């Protein structure tokens, strides 16, 4: 599977922090493979240094207001109406070390084309994987809209 991530990703999201956390930056890449997707995330300047942060694909976009920066992100991407943590958009929490996080995993819950136009959200706290409907992971502190990567 590592050969797939040495190619141009099918989709990507540029992550930017909320006004409260403007230094958060990163990229999330989506590579279509076999019957699913490899997701690779590289995030910098997360708060709290060494902590877990909820990491989800949401139905909507990163649009919002100054008071609610990502108000239009809506709920977790959940095309099958599953219970949390079985939403298609439920991804493993990010573990920050010195404010930096790197994560790579495979999922068969979606293909890259299914999530184009949706939002990747990073939350202030870890997803407890229990609380309904979304894991009690706190405020949305960073967001990136998933865009198709064009190949020539």
Language-model-detected regions and their locations in the chain:
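N-terminal leader/targeting pre-sequences
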Residues: 1-152
């Amino acid at each position: 599977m590592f050969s797939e991530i040495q190619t141009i990703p099918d989709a990507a999201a540029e992550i930017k922090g909320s006004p409260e956390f403007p230094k958060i930056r990163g990229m999330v890449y989506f590579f279509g493979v076999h019957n699913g997707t490899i997701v690779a995330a590289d995030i910098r300047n997360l708060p709290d240094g060494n902590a877990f942060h909820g990491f989800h694909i949401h139905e909507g976009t990163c649009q919002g207001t100054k008071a609610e920066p990502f108000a239009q992100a809506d709920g977790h991407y959940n095309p099958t109406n599953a219970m949390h943590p079985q939403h298609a958009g439920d991804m493993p929490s990010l573990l920050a070390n010195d404010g930096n996080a790197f994560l790579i995993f495979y999922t068969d819950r979606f293909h890259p084309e299914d999530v184009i136009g949706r939002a990747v959200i990073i939350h202030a706290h870890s997803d407890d994987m229990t609380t309904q409907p979304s894991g009690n992971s706190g405020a949305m502190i960073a967001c990136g809209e998933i865009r198709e990567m064009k190949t020539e």
